[in-house]
Amino acid sequence: KQTLFSLLMCVLAIAGCDTQKQAIVGYELALTRAKQTLDSLYLNYSVSGTCLLRENYPSNIGEYTATYLASEEQKNMPNLYSYLWPYSGTFSAVNALFATTGDKEYKSVLDNKVLVGLEEYFDTRRTPEAYASYINSAPQSDRFYDDNVWLGIDFTDTYMLTKEPKYLQKAQLIWNFIE
């Protein structure tokens, strides 16, 4: 009985070690894929001279129409840049990479690329201030609660990671819009 128990413990220990190794390999693979996806996104969707992204790839600005828009008028207007909803996904993605790795490179990408582009959507013409669905240099666009809620969560997450008050202040501005 004691030999069988010892053998069982050895098998469980070995199986547990293998599971841990697989988890580490799975984590590293997922992290590599996340980094490659972010790099590919900026390689293929970036708009030269800006921190903004295109709506689609390959970019066919004259032919592309966003079928998810509220009106036919908006749908038929070509846009040089993505709408807020797809753009804001970069904020969540870079936040997740920063939180996972602790690599300050992602903080730099966040501050010098993602948030710079995001500010192009920040609408100060209406109160309370909030993020609009399209960039401010275009005609005034809608502001959606759900888009802003997700951004508020991302700003809060960034604040929790960095303890820098500027992120919390932005989350509070968004909350004023949601309220």
Segments from the language model and where they lie:
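Intrinsic disorder/low-complexity segments enriched in polar/small residues
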Residues: 2-3, 21
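Sec-dependent N-terminal signal peptides
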Residues: 3-12
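Catalytic-loop motifs flanking and including active-site residues across diverse enzymes
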Residues: 6, 86-89, 147
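Low-complexity, Ser/Thr/Pro/Gly-enriched N-terminal "stalk/linker" regions
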Residues: 18-138, 165-179
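Residue-level signature for tetratricopeptide repeat
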Residues: 97, 154, 158-161
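Mobile, glycine-rich extracellular loop/lid and propeptide segments
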Residues: 142-155, 164-174
